[in-house]
Amino acid sequence: MRKIRTKICGITTLEDAAAAAAAGADAVGLVFFQGSSRAVDIARAKKITAALPPFVSVVALFVNESAQNIRRILAEVPIHIIQFHGDEDDAFCRQFDRPYIKAIRVQTASDIRNAADRFPDAQALLFDAYHPSEYGGTGHRFDWTLLAEYSGKPWVLAGGLTPENVGEAVRITGAEAVDVSGGVEASKGKKDPAKVAAFIATANRLSR
């Protein structure tokens, strides 16, 4: 049986974390990038993680953050996985004694093809839509057919996913993990519990 893993990213409140966990999310994402409307500080992140049930992974998202600040956050917040969304290289990403996921902003097939060689120590790659000035969470999607034949390092599909299109996305790409933020929001930084539940329910149906 294939299990489609789900991550709800951009969690900013206890209520949204609880809704994601209750719906069956495998992971929640906390954004530590102050340029994002979904950013959280250490105090809020600690409250959110303390309220999560066991076996829900916590992913910390960073964008071109300093190593010093990353270490400070990791020392105070129980983070299971780090997700790098900026211009970090493999040497930078692997230094924090945590598994890491590297986001790849996809423009062409070569971005996908070369990613594993560029980030050999990544636990997984996250393929997201390219935007010239934003580092994810844009609501844009890329050409999913570029992933149809990909068989490299484990990977996560992101970029413009919604409860309505995640089924199609998984069927086209063969994704075994999906990541959503804006597609399940009521407004920037605030999740819609019904959309969260619908997104995860669709992924679960595809897991058969």
UniProtKB/Swiss-Prot annotation:
InterPro entries: Aldolase_TIM, PRAI_dom, RibuloseP-bd_barrel, TrpF_fam. Pathway: Amino-acid biosynthesis; L-tryptophan biosynthesis; L-tryptophan from chorismate: step 3/5. It catalyses: N-(5-phospho-beta-D-ribosyl)anthranilate = 1-(2-carboxyphenylamino)-1-deoxy-D-ribulose 5-phosphate. It holds the Pfam family PRAI. Keywords: Amino-acid biosynthesis, Aromatic amino acid biosynthesis, Isomerase, Tryptophan biosynthesis. GO terms for molecular function: phosphoribosylanthranilate isomerase activity. Disulfide bonds: none annotated. Its EC number is 5.3.1.24. Signal peptide: none annotated. It comes from the Bacteria. GO terms for biological process: L-tryptophan biosynthetic process. The keyword Nucleus does not apply. Belongs to the TrpF family. This is N-(5'-phosphoribosyl)anthranilate isomerase. It comes from Neisseria meningitidis serogroup C (strain 053442).
